[in-house]
Amino acid sequence: MSITITLRKWQAEAVKRSDHLSNGIFLEALGGRGKTICALAISKHKKAKKIIITNNRLSILNGWIDAVKFMNFDKDVEIIIQTDRYLQNKVKKGHKLDCDVLIVDEWQNMSSDKQVALYRKIKRKYTIGLSATPIRKKGQNFYPLEKTVFGWATPNNKFDWQKTHGKMVYDPFSYSKEKWEDFRNYESYISNLPNFFRWEDIEKIENATENNGFETKFYPVTVKAGNPEKLAEFRQLNLVTVGD
């Protein structure tokens, strides 16, 4: 059976934004908005022949396996869905990792120094970062976010980046005698990132009257479903439309 998925309006907009002159895109969408399907749609749009998807939880990765089935990728597309620990072990054993698109799911849990070091060793053409709540360490994990998703940070040096964007406070135990307390101006900072799709913008699109992506509501079934397995998958992935 051939399946066609109708993207939500914000997802279609994200696919368009992936054409920007940037090495990647970050999707800060709330839970249930369809980040998984959107990331796969962008990968398809990029005509990726090899995709690596990583998260640190197997339960989350199992959801990706289910979503991939809906996207009708060509048979010659290789999709690797693995934990960061598995990929780190591959690198330790001397394997070279490469792909067309790297998808890092749940950035807030995937931005440790060890994980970021792994991303540097994965040769790729494009990166997609996903999270509903990306901020950790009071925002300090946005420096590796820039480096990982966009290929560089502004400024590119970590110390200069912190001085530029951070509200620094005195710390007698630090070499520089100061430490990061919080963003100096988060709104200004985030608005200048190369390709960061903010949740506020996504919600505006989702709640627009002309949007086809209203929150999906399932009403009591009055007729027995002809294909209950497909209906269950439809609900799990929170799809707008699935057609033959």
Question: Predicted regions span which residues?
Answer:
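N-terminal pre-P-loop "Q-motif" helix
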Residues: 4-21
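Walker B catalytic acidic pair
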Residues: 105-107
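Conserved helix-turn-beta segment of the N-terminal RecA-like "Helicase ATP-binding" lobe
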Residues: 48-51, 58-79, 149-152
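Hydrophobic residues on the short alpha-helix immediately C-terminal to a glycine-rich phosphate/catalytic loop
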Residues: 18, 38-46, 145
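Conserved helix/coil segment N-terminal to the catalytic DExD/H
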Residues: 80-101, 112-118
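Conserved P-loop NTPase motor "coupling/switch" region that bridges the ATPase
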Residues: 101, 118-207
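Walker A/P-loop
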Residues: 22-42, 131
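Conserved helicase/translocase motor-coupling segment
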Residues: 204-244
